[in-house]
Regions:
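Active-site cavity-forming subdomains of large catalytic enzyme subunits
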Residues: 1-50
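Glycine/charged-rich beta-loop-alpha catalytic/anionic-binding loops adjacent to active sites
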Residues: 19-25, 65, 183-185
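Anaerobic metallocofactor- and corrinoid-dependent redox/one-carbon enzyme cores
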Residues: 31, 58, 63, 69-191
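Short amphipathic alpha-helices and their capping/turn segments at secondary-structure boundaries
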Residues: 46-52, 82-85
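Glycine-rich phosphate/diphosphate-binding loops that line cofactor/substrate pockets in enzymes
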Residues: 50-60
Length: 191
């Protein structure tokens, strides 16, 4: 996968070696030590910048799975959703990722589509992922991991409802492809 990432960077043109650091964990003896060293380099690079205030409307935050259990849908995920709604109310944007996490609760997001075009994009997004699973002989509705189940998640719907709570109550503004820049402020779903 790292080769693909490096190739993507090369296709996009040059990059700043001080700003972008990476390691291939299989190629290093002690990934914690190397990781710390890479972080030190990033911190040193960042120290050269001056902080300044910018409006919240320029902030984009990704909402990713943090490990679901029986309490995350009651505690952390609603809090993240409230943050998302607050940021969006200030003109900022959030991106809800991990489409398979949405399976089982996708209609909640469909019902919040900003318009018919966005609704169609959400339907296409969900169906494309389900078709991908089917083409590769994967079970669509068996997403909870053993760890999720041990933590109290009993069904895909339990897990999916937790996922959708991270998006708050804002309308879904758009669906974007991986690597695409947000065109519409607000809640975006990532392909």
């Amino acid at each position: 996968q790292m080769d693909s990432f490096i190739e993507l960077l090369r296709e996009r043109g040059s990059w700043n070696d001080e700003r972008i650091q990476w390691m291939i964990t299989q190629d290093v003896e002690d990934e914690l030590a190397i990781g710390r060293e890479l972080l030190k380099r990033c911190i040193s690079y960042a120290a050269g910048f001056r902080r300044r205030e910018i409006p919240s409307s320029r902030l984009v935050v990704g909402l990713k799975c943090g490990g679901s259990d029986g309490l995350s849908g009651l505690t952390a995920n609603p809090l993240v959703g409230a943050f998302s709604d607050d940021l969006i109310a200030q003109g900022g944007s959030t991106i809800l990722t991990e489409v398979p996490e949405m399976f089982g609760a996708e209609t909640i997001l469909m019902n919040r589509a900003a318009d018919r075009t966005v609704y169609g994009k959400i339907v296409s997004l969900i169906n494309s992922f389900k078709e991908y699973f089917i083409r590769h002989n994967q079970t669509v509705y068996e997403n909870p991991s053993p760890g999720n189940k041990k933590g109290g998640i009993s069904t895909l719907e339990d897990k999916s409802l937790g996922c959708t709570q991270k998006s708050g109550d804002a309308p879904v503004a758009d669906v974007i492809r991986y690597g695409q820049v947000i065109r519409t402020p607000g809640l975006n779903l990532l392909q």
